[in-house]
Amino acid sequence: VTLLEFRDLRVTYTGSRGRLPAVRGVDLSVDAGETLGIAGESGCGKSTLAMAVLRLLPKHAEVTGQILLDGEDLLAMGWGRLRAVRWTAASIVFQGAMHSLNAVQRIGRQVAEPILLHERTTPAKAA
């Protein structure tokens, strides 16, 4: 079953130098249980692609296409629904994991922390 899908995703930044395409026509899918790694040179759009998933891009970024999470279009979601998804179904660990993750705590505990803060569940289920 497809968990995450990009359909013709495009991100263009607009600034003093005009329009700059950062992501051009990405089509890919990730099924439940699969792992996806995105690699490339500095400035090729990896972070832009990841930030687009949770709509964390700056206001001057124009995003078109579709990003489907469990069949639901993240780009069409209202802010309330998006906020709920950010805490329960999707999250991001930014580049430089040494600054994002605590080296003296298990990763599972760190990933589970926001779930425990926002959901009624046990630590075992959250991890």
Residue ranges and their predicted role:
Residues 1-127:
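ABC transporter nucleotide-binding domains
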